Amino acid sequence: MQDFIKINKDDNVAVALKPIAKGTTLNVAGIDVTTVEDIPQGHKFVIKAIKIGDPVIKYGFRIGFAQADIPVGAWVHTHNLKTGLGELLEYTYEPEGHKDVEPTEPAYFDGYMRENGKVGVRNEVWIVPTVGCVNSIARAIEATARANKPEGVDEVVAFTHPYGCSQTTEDQENTRKILADLINHPNAGAVLVLGLGCENSRIEVLKDYIGEVNPDRVKFLQVQDVENEQEEAEKLMNELMAYAATFKREKVNAKELIIGMKCGGSDGLSGITANPTVGLFSDMLVSKGGTTILTEVPEMFGAETILMNRCANKELFEKTVHLINDFKEYFIKNGQEIYENPSPGNKDGGITTLEDKSLGCTQKSGSSLVKGVLAYAEPVNTKGLNLLSAPGNDLVAATACAASGAQMVLFTTGRGTPFASPVPTVKIATNSRLAGNKGNWIDFNAGRIVTDDLPLEDAAKELFQLVLDVASGKKVKAEIAGFHDLAIFKQGVTL
């Protein structure tokens, strides 16, 4: 196991891969560096003296400016490093030197072919409430249906939420779009849409967003219109489960996979282990004709030009500029400083500034060209790497990936989290300590890249196989625990 890593040849800091004691002498690229204080795991230390006001370089890019003279061997963190991010910026499209990944041999998994041509990796029956007022009824329906679930139906899930009424303008529109996206999701073999009757987003309104449906697959129940909603729901659920049970897994080309990519509870190893592993995975899937979705726009701030210059054309570049600046304007409108993002857990794990976090976060995008830029709740329609507008919040962003069509989400974490999303959510640990302590949460240990000297390419191949296995029916830890979460982006007034 290495003591440290210098990520890029131009960096003036290195990252401790394990705790390094004060007075330890390390050979960094042929130069002896002696630490002048203890360096925690995942944190940065200086390998070339940095003067006050000079940039601190990591990943080959600036992550902020020194707030004091920092000698060789010193710890670099919030006490002596400050962000260099500002407000809205002007950007220039500079695509030279970027090319897409080369096509590779196809891969396959066992999935569910739907009548509309989409492919699911689960065959579940979903209950989608139009409004939070019927959440308790939805959960009761879920419990009854689970007790009667036939063979061939993976699970019955009620996706409760607090919205659907007392919302205005964009919030109400977003709720309707997200619910419609879920109703049309291929992981759902069948869906019961459960309404109250007097809400803003009542069933008749929502139908305009859902579009044409197969009445065997999607059924509607407005509970104010019936005498006994439980009896009516049980009848409808039995019909829906019988329909869903007719689908069987069959061999499907991996080009049909759409995988969301998200990180949360990041630490100083996120950009060294788990995120680059996911990035290589993304390149592998794209090379086989598949699709990946990168979101959490605020965690692109400071690294956005990397993604902009990888846009396949000028139109996508302009869309990415709007993606970034629209989110910055959202922050400004609400009086939030753009750069105040790293959480206490991020900082404890070694991430200092938003640039530091973002440069690690965008490692998940790999090296392929950006082929699509999506608005929040917009379904993906272009194969390859897509950027999706959504905030950094774990539940909101992961739900957004699912709503845009992801059949699965890859979630990297250095601190750990038990949450789930509407689709299988693969938890990838950045460090082996987390993987060992939280084996009931973690599905893949990318920390072995550090502790076991596992080559990054081998880790990515293992992850690719795990994704195929999960797509073929293997349950992730959150599914085993029975976790299924949903969160919708809220920005405005609640009436």
What residue spans do the PLM features occupy?
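Metallocofactor- and cofactor-centric catalytic cores in central/energy metabolism, strongly enriched
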Residues: 1-408, 415-418, 423-495
